[in-house]
Structure formats: C-alpha cells, structure tokens
A protein has these predicted regions:
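Extracytosolic ligand-binding ectodomains
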Residues: 2-10, 21-343
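N-terminal signal peptide c-region/cleavage motif recognized by signal peptidases
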Residues: 16-18
C-alpha cells in the first residue's frame, strides 16, 4: 500500500509506489503556527485520521497530502496557493480557516481551473455573483450560523444585546447575519483586533452599555481569553453571554467549567447519531486524547468529499469531481450532504 505524506510546511514529497500509478495530490492549507495553530493542528489531525480510515487512498487512487502553514497571513496564503498549484501541481486545494485568507486565494485557485474546497471559511462576498464553479464549501456561508443565534435570541424575547467580533471579513459577516434575524436594541457593535488577547477595555465598555445579553464571535485562542476574562470580571451578573464559533472542542479543554451556561449555535456536534460521526469521534479521541472540534469534523468531511468525488467519477479531473459534488449525497459526519448553488 502506498504511503501518504503529511508535510507541516510547503515541500515537495513523493510517495513510494508503482511507476505509472496515478496519484491524486491535495494541498491542504491551514494555520499551524502561532496562537491560531491550536485550530490548524486539530484540522491536520482530522485529515490524517481520514487518510488512515481510507487506507492512504482517495477514491481508490494513491494519494499525497501536502500541508501548508499559512501563518494566518493573506500574503503567505497566496504565495503558498501558487506554489501548491505551480510547483506541487496539486489536483485540489483545500482547508483554510480564515475568511480573509480564503478571499486572498479564491481567484488565483479557481481561475487556474483547480478545485478549491473550503473546510471552514465562508466569506459572503464569494457567494452570489462572485461565486466560482470551482469553489465548494464543506462548512457554511459565514452569516448562516449567527442567523440561527439571532433568531433564537429574538424568539427568546431578549430586548437588548451587545455585539463583538474580530475586525475581518468573517467577523463582519457574523454580526451581519445575527442582525438579519434579531430585531431588538443593539447597545454596541465592537470590532476587535484579529488575534487580540486582552479584552479588559472592551469588557469595561460592555459593562457600561447595560445590555441584557452579549453575543460574540471570537474563534480559537481569542475565545478562550475572552471567556476567561469575562468570568474573572464577574460579567455573568451584568449580561448573559451567547456565542458562535467561540466555545467548542478547541476551547473547552482550556475553559473547563468556565464554559458552563454559555449557549452557542453550531452545525455539528460530537454526539450526532450517525455511523460516520461515531467512528470519527471515537477514533479521534482514542488517537489524540481529546474530543474533536467542528474544525476537525469539517476537515475530516473535506477528505470524505474528495474521496467521494473521485470514487464516483473515476477521475481526478476538476470538472468531473465538481459535477459529483454538485449532485450531493456526500457522506459526512453530519449525514449525507446536499449542495446548493450560489452561482
């Protein structure tokens, strides 16, 4: 059996095997360094687990996975995407946590005729008229999940809310989605620095605002720091905290009991009752000693989607894989997915 390669930085790597065997190459871009590396490592773990489950093959073809560390920098992401396509000649570019990075690589990859599959980022500008037929999302459009939170808080009769998110594309999308369904009073709408770790000034302003509830989007380490500082400041007595993509499998090991009582909306849960999810969660816990996050689940699903597309089409051709994915019925941890079109 041909082995598959995991590389933590961009590098050329060839698998050992038969001289004329066809190999599918996937460039998987995520953040593996810095504070955001906690998210990227879960995604890398999930990709490796999926490849183990598939015996190192995708759709029956020998497979090579090349991991690229984007360092959470758009310019680095663009350079890596070009290298993956031009030097490594990958068949698929996948992954991407951050919406500003996906915005940076979207046009170069799709216009090259390469299939681009997002495991997480879903910036609203690339839906609708800016959508490209070579782009597929295995997650969401950013505004969708906070729309659910907005509807919940509206239905719950919450009269006023304070909003907070990082100042980048996803943060703006999240709050826009929330406001689409929440019609109460917005006491404040604050955009923090991406990667910010100290929220004392924001908490002071929030306390003074007197909002009945607070809704935040602060993924990864930002959410860990925010919730810890919220608790230390005794903010539970001031405002009820609601979150999207802020309290999850990435942050729970650090937050522990501090997360109790915080409500969030999400499209995946480790206790979803289907065979694929049970195997994924069970094997992930056994191998890595912790529950997976939704980031990990979506990374795992991305590999399942590529496997499905190649198996059903019998090809790694972009148009043929794209056609299979558009038809839906993709087996994932969330059940069999259907695909809509935003083109």
């Amino acid at each position: 059996m041909k082995r598959f390669i995991t590389v933590c930085a961009i590098s050329a790597a060839m698998t050992a095997g038969t001289a004329f065997a066809e190999t599918v190459k996937v460039g998987y871009m995520t953040t593996l360094s810095g504070g955001a590396g906690i998210i990227g490592k879960q995604m890398q773990n999930a990709v490796n687990l999926a490849m183990e489950h598939k015996g190192g093959k995708l759709g029956g073809m020998d497979a090579e996975i090349i991991f690229a560390d984007d360092q959470r920098k758009p310019d680095v992401a663009k350079q890596l995407a070009n290298r993956l396509m031009k030097s490594d000649r990958v068949d698929v570019v996948a992954g991407v946590i951050w919406s500003n990075l996906l915005m940076a690589i979207h046009k170069p990859v799709t216009r090259n005729g390469t299939l681009l599959i997002s495991s997480n980022a879903g910036p609203s500008p690339i839906a609708g008229t800016q959508c490209n037929k070579n782009f597929v999302s295995m997650s969401w459009q950013n505004d969708q999940t906070p729309e659910g939170m907005g509807k919940h808080m509206q239905d719950a009769g919450i009269k006023s809310v304070y909003l907070m998110a990082p100042n980048y594309q996803a943060g703006k999308d999240m709050l826009a989605g929330f406001k689409r369904y929440y019609k109460g009073t917005i006491k404040g709408e604050v955009y923090t620095k991406l990667g910010q770790s100290d929220f004392q000034a924001e908490l002071s302003a929030l306390r003074a605002a007197g909002a009945q509830a607070t809704m935040i989007f602060q993924p990864g380490g930002m959410g860990i720091n925010f919730v810890k500082q919220w608790k230390q400041a005794g903010m539970d007595s001031v405002s009820k905290l609601y979150t999207v993509f802020s309290v999850d499998g990435v942050s729970l090991p650090a937050l522990k009991d501090a997360a109790i009582g915080i409500l969030g909306t999400q499209t995946w849960s480790p206790d979803l009752d289907n065979a694929i999810n049970k195997k994924f969660v069970g094997d992930y816990k056994a191998k890595f000693g912790a529950y997976p996050s939704f980031y990990a689940a979506q990374a795992y699903d991305t590999i399942l989607a590529i496997d499905h597309a190649i198996a059903k089409s019998g090809s790694k051709d972009t148009a043929k894989m794209r056609s299979i994915l558009a038809a839906g019925n993709i087996p994932t941890t969330r059940g069999n997915l259907k695909m809509n079109t935003n083109q």
